[in-house]
């Protein structure tokens, strides 16, 4: 019997983004680990996991969180340790979105969006996805609209990290408006 896909995916994200060493994995500078070694690490919690199952998770992930190259796998974004990412630059998006609990609004409007414990700020090309992401951190969520051209004019590069996920070093407050 296969374990629940969502649970395995969450564990994959935890391992690949935050704590590979806890499972005996050593990522390279781009965050890749051996696919076989990841499968073995996942089996310590979910013994039924197979490489095929992990590949299905990667192929069907709605946000494009993972990437497989040959016999290696990595998280495409969200790392809390330094990783050299080689993502394509997004030069076309006009507006990006970020959902956040209302309680964070005063500091965001004053200081902008910062990566906090991660390498980059995560934003979305999709309003609904941004709101859903924000709801993981609180019930009363507001939608921030980010002017991508404003970011580019200030020298910030926006990278395509997932299907609708974009990452940027930070977002200054003057590039943010509150959606109505």
Swiss-Prot record:
Keyword terms, alphabetized: NAD, Transferase
Annotated GO MF terms: NAD+ poly-ADP-ribosyltransferase activity; tRNA 2'-phosphotransferase activity
Pfam families with a match to the protein in the record: PTS_2-RNA (PF01885)
The keyword NAD belongs to this UniProt entry's keyword annotation: yes
EC number: 2.7.1.-
NAD found in the keyword field: yes
GO biological process: tRNA splicing, via endonucleolytic cleavage and ligation
Signal sequence range: none
Domain of life, per lineage: Archaea
Top enzyme class: transferase
NCBIfam families for this protein: PRK00819.1-2
Entry's family note: Belongs to the KptA/TPT1 family.
Role played: Removes the 2'-phosphate from RNA via an intermediate in which the phosphate is ADP-ribosylated by NAD followed by a presumed transesterification to release the RNA and generate ADP-ribose 1''-2''-cyclic phosphate (APPR>P). May function as an ADP-ribosylase.
Protein name: Probable RNA 2'-phosphotransferase
Source lineage: Archaea, Methanobacteriati, Methanobacteriota, Thermococci, Thermococcales
């Amino acid at each position: 019997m296969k374990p629940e896909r969502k649970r395995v995916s969450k564990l994959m994200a935890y391992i690949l983004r935050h704590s590979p060493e806890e499972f005996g994995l050593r990522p390279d500078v781009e965050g890749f680990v051996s696919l076989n070694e990841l499968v073995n690490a996942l089996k310590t919690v979910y013994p039924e996991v197979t490489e095929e199952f992990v590949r299905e998770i990667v192929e069907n992930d709605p946000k494009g969180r993972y990437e497989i190259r040959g016999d290696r796998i990595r998280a495409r974004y969200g790392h809390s340790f330094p990783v050299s990412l080689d993502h394509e630059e997004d030069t076309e998006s006009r507006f990006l979105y970020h959902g956040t609990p209302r309680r964070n609004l005063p500091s965001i409007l004053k200081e902008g969006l910062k990566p906090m414990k991660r390498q980059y700020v995560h934003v979305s090309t999709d309003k609904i996805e941004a709101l859903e992401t924000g709801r993981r951190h609180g019930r009363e969520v507001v939608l921030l609209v980010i002017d991508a051209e404003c970011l580019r004019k200030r020298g910030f590069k926006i990278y395509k990290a997932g299907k609708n996920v974009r990452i940027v070093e930070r977002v200054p407050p003057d590039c943010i408006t509150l959606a109505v």
